[in-house]
Amino acid sequence: PLAGPDVFGISSGAGLAVAIVMLAFGGNIALGDFMGADFLGNGATAGVGVSGFLAILIAAFVGAMLVMAVITFFSAIVRSHTVLLIIGLMVGYLASSAISLLNFFSTAEGVKSYMVWGMGSFGNVSAAQVLWFIPLALIALIASLLLVKPLNAMLLGEQYAENLGFNIRRLRIILLLITGFLTAVVTAFCGPIAFIGLATPHIARLLIGTENHRRLLPVTMLLGSVLALLCNLFCTLPSGGGIIPLNAVTPLFGAPVIIYVLLKRR
């Protein structure tokens, strides 16, 4: 029940790679090119903006995929899900430690840029950036929907799925690529968003009362977007022109759900 990109350290890995890119350029990519209004704009800044965006996107993807590769490697050795979860948490702590060291040795502008990005926000995503986000996300979402049959077969056990003719090793690799790609895309645009990906599948199961991925995946996608927008709405409620960081609100929705699921399984 605790499997998620933030718990297994995937988001932390993506965040570490982005931190290396951002802090290496003193925050110029984050503030000037990637987050700024000139991204994909006119004139000479357009090419720089695209380069900055691609650097962050590629860095997030590489960081997420490296952590996913580590988790996949240990999953072939460790049978206990609890031990695998602890390994994921330790990987996340290592990434967080490296990020802290990078912040310590970086410039004030670089630290500010990364801290603003790391708190998570939808407000810095412009309409031009959405044109990049939609096709990239749709590719991975459609690919995940094509895996409904093997995922349903996996519910009855790996041996049963193999007897039906599904290649479990190839399925795991495909799921690895899809998960890493989606995590990288969301992290690159909005920063590391916690608890949404962890809690939404459990809420969807409680609402529809089934494990059938043919229904569960679409409901989870829709519900995840609704919860994300709801959290973003709460972030904009305070007066005074300030916006609360997204990661300050998402645990208010996600943590109670996870606690409930753990108590129910007990």
Predicted regions and their residues:
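Alpha-helical transmembrane segments in inner-membrane proteins
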Residues: 1-266
